[in-house]
Amino acid sequence: MEIYRKSAAETFTQLEATEKGLTTSEVTKRQEKYGFNELKNKKKDPLWKLFLETFKDPMVIVLVIAALVQLVLGEVVESLIIFLVLIVNSIISVVQTRKAESSLDALREMSAPVAKVIRDGSKQSIHARELVPGDVVILDAGDFVPADGRLFESGSLKIDEGMLTGESEAVEKYIDTIPDEVGLGDRVNMVFSGSLVVYGRGMFVVTGTASETEIGKIAGLLETAEAKQTPLQRKLESFSKKLGLGILALCVLIFAVEAGRVLLGDNSADMATAILNAFMFAVAVAVAAIPEALSSIVTIVLAVGTNKMAKQHAIIRKLPAVETLGSTSVICTDKTGTLTQNKMTVVDYYLPDGTKENFPESPENWSEGERRLIHIAVLCNDSNINSEGKELGDPTEVALIAFSNKNNQDYNEIREKFIREGEIPFDSDRKLMSTLHTFNENKAMLTKGGPDVMFARCSYVFLDGEEKPMTEEILAKLKETNEEFSNQALRVLAYGYKRMPADTTELKLEDEQDIVLVGLTAMIDPPREAVYASIEESKKAGIRTVMITGDHKTTAQAIGRDIGLMDADDIALTGQELDAMPEEELDKKLEHIAVYARVSPENKIRIVKAWQKKGKITAMTGDGVNDAPALKQADIGVAMGSGTDVAKDSAAMILTDDNFVSIVDAVGVGRTVFDNIKKSIAYLFAGNLGAIIAILFALVLDWINPFTALQLLFINLVNDSLPAIALGMEKAEPDVMKRKPRDINEGIFAGGTMRAVISRGVLIGIAVIISQYIGMQISPEMSVAMAFTTLILARTLQTFAARSNVQTAFGAGFFSNKYVIGAVLLCFVLYGITVLPGAREIFSIPASFGLHEWSIAAGLALAAVVMMEIIKVVQNKFFK
């Protein structure tokens, strides 16, 4: 049986402890048994292991093999270039992994550093890490709870448990036994490590420390929550495997054909040299086919996306998250602080004369009823706003003094004018608070509390400027108004006063009778203003928004309906209802559950997994410790900037303005980034395909290999990188936020990308073949030089065609992407370097290669690109 279902006495018996605390010797024994009250460090992998892990990627393995082959053949420069690219990518990956491991460190820092305990029969202050089960701990306002425990004393104790439960209001604590099984947020006789005491005092016996606390359990969930691959990572990994196998098979075939020619041909030739040439042909195909710079370019394009998102108030911690967010189909969002402002606010009020809603902004225009309502709300109140603007006290009471300030009445002026002379503190049993003040030499008790309790104690009502007897009609109207407010999920408080004898110096419980009712206030943690539009925008983008909160079901439903998150056929579930629901039933109802209330961290992970099981890319937003495991489990975790360090460190993205709108904006950027990555990939593979076609054509016709390995590496690693990165800077397509989310099984060459790769690759290949043929009429060396020049120019000019699969270069705005213009010009400069004296020999360009040959190569390259644009126009007009 759970501790909260046992009495305090039973708990002490189970723990073999008493209210007088443990003895020093008993503490020593228990520390040996339970250890210290701190979260254990999970052993981190050494840097060398993380570094080697990055070389498991199939594309990386293929590149390593290619580099080793180059090294064996004595091509040291080519080999070193490939290895350098791989090492840089690995270092970036290791740095990102190390940053992601900081979640548990933040959790450890949340533990209270000092605890007030009773040991050996006396009060002591100790380090919180020294606590053991059975210790008796004293709590006062402002204290962090140092361990989990069962309360046995409570004096108006209120604790903010929002970091664990997501609850927006402080929880009133009791010591009574709870007979039924309830969720974490309803265990009001328990306290939890890391939560904050905002009001009152109490004493509890420690029932759990370290990993046995609720925070400790969350730490365990963080360790077991799976880190998901992004859709792009999954697609590139799958494609890399297929590409590697395909290239291997092609290379073996090429080598077999060439070797067969040698063995079946003229044996008088130098067989060893011929076999080596055959092997070099195969290596050239491997180098031409593998886009060596692909990994680096994808990383850079994603980084460009992070900069764009930063301007939209979204900071990316993990680069692949940019692309993942763009493919998101479900956003599981916390309510408090995400959809709402995380600040209780008075939104309505009611006076017995019927006045409500619009409170006069100037105190001079207040009615006497409004003036008295404000005075009671401010004076019968223990909260404050300090000189730094920090709000201190219960959020509900802070809302009341903020209400006064909002209506141009400084609450401090009221308190300075009417000093508190006595009080009866708030008590969770009677649900009232009363204070004593003097008004114009007349003593009065001011009282605020729950409406039902106040109605029962009010014999009079302040109406039309006079104190009148409470009638059944007036009481019925008050109850009706209270019900209206409650149905809107508003928190209602009632206010009243009672005239006291002039010699009154202190208040007694029996004084809280025959009160004069003044009015009601209604408050709520209101939705963020921009949330309404962002929810609608997400619907247009085909994204399902689901609210997951620790708050009450009624409140969550009201907010959900208000902001348009819940449709007519949608339902809400509590954490307990979810726990009782079998997987099959959840699977059937999942798409109609818009709100989950009173949920636990385990519930959140289950919800995320349920959506992922349906193949949906799922984002999870949150700001509390309770959100951290689900943030890690989700395909992309989105933490609020004002949230806990634990949430931020578990997330892939952080919103600096805590604005839900920023998520929708970031989705648009993410979709654009993925579009641009596909453009870059198509650009790279079209160029590579053109090179392979030329090589295979030369092989079939027994021509000389049109390229050297160094030429291909120069194009793949240096020349192609600049335009590919520039394509990552393209602006969003007009329909980017009107499309449905991408199918996660959709390949990276879907949506016309493969068609573009093939058509552009074939045109580049044809241009190179023609150029090589023309060069062969002069010399074998000239054929290589012309093939290389045509390939590099065609691939460079292809950048303009690659900007869009729909629009031509002029349709998209020829100069609208200045990075493309700059990249193309720089590529021409880089090519110019290869024909300079000294460099010609390195790149196998003969001295006789001049302007005439260059003009032929350039003309063929330009013709290929013009044909690409013509094909694009024809396809879009007749085959759309």
Curated annotation (Swiss-Prot):
Residues that span the membrane, as ranges: 47-67, 68-88, 243-263, 271-291, 681-701, 707-727, 756-776, 819-839, 854-874
The residues annotated as the active site are 334 (4-aspartylphosphate intermediate)
CDD domains given for it?
Answer: P-type_ATPase_Ca_prok (cd02089)
Q: Which residues form a coiled coil?
A: none
Q: What is its main location?
A: membrane
Q: Does the keyword Transport apply?
A: yes
- GO BP: any one term: monoatomic ion transmembrane transport
Mutation: residue 691 to E; reported impact is: Displays optimal activity near pH 8.0
Q: Which InterPro entries match?
A: ATPase_P-typ_cation-transptr_C, ATPase_P-typ_cation-transptr_N, ATPase_P-typ_cyto_dom_N, ATPase_P-typ_P_site, ATPase_P-typ_TM_dom_sf, ATPase_P-typ_transduc_dom_A_sf, HAD-like_sf, HAD_sf
Its keywords, alphabetically, are:
ATP-binding, Calcium, Calcium transport, Cell membrane, Ion transport, Membrane, Metal-binding, Nucleotide-binding, Phosphoprotein, Translocase, Transmembrane, Transmembrane helix, Transport
User: Do you know which SMART domains this protein is assigned to?
Assistant: Cation_ATPase_N
SUPFAM superfamilies (alphabetical): Calcium ATPase, transduction domain A, Calcium ATPase, transmembrane domain M, HAD-like, Metal cation-transporting ATPase, ATP-binding domain N
Q: Where in the cell is it found?
A: Cell membrane
Catalytic activities: Ca(2+)(in) + ATP + H2O = Ca(2+)(out) + ADP + phosphate + H(+)
Q: What is its EC number?
A: 7.2.2.10
| Entries under Gene3D superfamilies matching the protein | Calcium-transporting ATPase, cytoplasmic domain N, Calcium-transporting ATPase, cytoplasmic transduction domain A, Calcium-transporting ATPase, transmembrane domain, HAD superfamily/HAD-like
Biological role stated in the UniProt entry: Catalyzes the hydrolysis of ATP coupled with the transport of calcium. The transport is electrogenic with a probable ATP:Ca(2+):H(+) stoichiometry of 1:1:1. May have an important role in survival of the bacterium when stressed by a combination of a high calcium concentration and alkaline pH.
The protein's name in its UniProt record: Calcium-transporting ATPase lmo0841
